[in-house]
A protein has these predicted regions:
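PDZ-domain C-terminal substructure recognizer with occasional recognition of PDZ-binding tails
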Residues: 228-270, 365-391, 396-404
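PDZ/PDZ-like peptide-tail recognition elements
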Residues: 73-106, 113-119, 123, 134-194, ...
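Terminal targeting segments of Actinobacterial cell-envelope proteins
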Residues: 1-47, 138-142, 151
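Hydrophobic membrane-insertion alpha-helices, especially the h-region
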Residues: 48-68
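Glycine- and Gly-Pro-enriched alpha-helical subdomains that act as flexible
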Residues: 308, 328-353
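PDZ/PDZ-like domain segments forming the peptide/carboxylate-binding groove
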Residues: 166-221, 331-336, 348, 357
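Short, glycine/polar-rich helix-capping loops at beta-to-alpha or helix-loop-helix junctions
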Residues: 355-366
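Terminal peptide-recognition signature
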Residues: 177, 205-208, 242, 273, ...
Length: 406
């Protein structure tokens, strides 16, 4: 009997997992890919996922680089040498123009400093800008509402900053002339009244001559500081007689004094007027500087006027920067962004910086490499600091480190 073997079964003696024959047309080899429903093989394309990831990354980058975010970035701003010149209407002109007094040339620099601010209305920043600022030690990122409230337009903010700049310039003139003895008194002119005082008593343009409280002595304040000191001695609700010069004639006004706001920290009472305070002098100064706002250059403006109107070179040829508000009595007050201002001054080449003593906590640890920073509380101290730097003897000057460790 002839034995017929099933060709699909292994031959005798062959391993069970070794094929001994193939069906017609079949090719031995790897397992064929699974077919799709349509009969075509399903093939994976990993490069498609790569392209999708790249596209999403590009879209994310574009969004980060173009969509504004509610942040403000403060960084080092420009500096101006107040003893130098600026371009105005295509011509070079002195930044400070003094009239009514002899002026003297200066060889050094007294730099006013600024902060560059981005993120307020009209100057948006993006997430990419913010990320860059996080890694820049000279920049700081703040919430927008801390710097520019949403209900204030760019135009309104500009107007406020320009008014602050103008006021600081006027006050700098008064402080400088009083410091140098070119004026020995001030003119106190009413420019407005508070809501509590209302209209009908003072008029804009009234010049305050004297104040007499009921049952008290008459005082003729010759400076704003004297007026402030007098008002601290008069209780709220006291009837006073105020003599003003109105249209060239003395006019007597009777009123009761007002109570200061609970959070004002002031003692005594108020007249309820806003004053324009100017030095009683024929000397005056104007400023050729546009597109810069805020009150923080007052101290440097005052130093510039002093250098221009006194013999010799106050700076001794040194490059000195600084910042600080100024009051008519010469008090130098705190400002914002002092770290950025020091960095900007260093970038401009200044080796010395005058900082308000009230800002020293923000100065220590942020001084640029190679820069000497000195604390000043008033204009007289600032003049002494510049003179010490010019003479090469700063041993008597106060550092911010010394202020913070008192």
């Amino acid at each position: 009997m002839t034995e017929h073997l099933d060709p699909t079964l292994p031959a005798p003696g062959a391993p069970a997992d070794t094929p001994t024959s193939t069906t017609a047309g079949a090719v031995p080899g790897p397992e064929a890919p699974e077919n799709t429903a349509g009969g075509r093989p399903r093939v994976a394309h990993p490069w498609r996922w790569l392209l999708a990831g790249v596209a999403l990354g590009i879209l994310a980058f574009i969004a980060a680089a173009t969509i504004p975010v509610p942040k403000v970035i403060e960084g080092p701003g420009r500096t101006w040498n107040v003893l130098g010149t600026v371009q105005s209407d295509g011509q070079s002109t002195d930044l400070i123009n003094v009239s009514g007094a002899q002026t003297y040339d200066a060889q050094g620099a007294l730099r006013m400093t600024t902060v560059s601010v981005s993120g307020c209305p009209g100057y948006p920043v993006t997430a990419l800008d913010v990320i860059h600022a996080w890694f820049d030690p000279d920049e700081v990122v703040l919430d927008r509402d801390q710097v520019c409230p949403r209900d204030v337009t760019a135009e309104q903010q500009h107007e406020v900053e320009q008014a602050q700049m103008t006021s600081s310039q006027d006050t700098a003139v008064t402080a400088a002339l009083m410091e140098t003895g070119q004026a020995d008194s001030m003119i106190l002119t009413v420019k407005g009244t508070s809501e509590e005082r209302g209209d009908g008593v003072f008029k804009a343009g009234d010049v305050i001559r004297s104040i007499t409280p009921a049952g008290g002595q008459t005082t003729t304040p010759s400076t704003y500081a004297q007026l402030q000191e007098l008002m601290t001695t008069i209780a709220p609700g006291t009837e006073v007689q105020v003599v003003v010069s109105r249209d060239g004639q003395d006019t007597s006004l009777t009123m009761t004094t007002l109570e200061p706001g609970k959070d004002s920290g002031r003692q005594g009472s108020l007249l309820g007027v806003m004053l324009d305070v100017r030095a009683n002098s024929d000397v005056n100064a104007t400023f050729s500087l546009s597109d810069v706002g805020g009150p923080s250059a007052g101290s440097m403006f005052a130093l510039g006027i002093i250098d221009k109107t006194t013999p010799g070179d106050l700076t001794g040829g040194k490059d000195i920067a600084g910042t600080g508000t100024i009051s008519s009595d010469g008090t130098i007050g705190p400002i914002g962004g002092i770290s950025q201002k020091m960095a900007g001054a260093s970038d401009a080449g200044s080796q010395y910086f005058l900082a308000p003593a009230s800002n020293c906590a923000d100065v220590v640890g942020h001084e640029p490499k190679g820069m000497e920073v000195y604390a000043v509380s008033n204009l007289h101290e600032a003049v002494q600091a510049v003179e010490g730097i010019a003479a090469g003897d700063t041993s008597s000057l106060t550092t911010c480190q010394a202020v913070t460790t008192r």
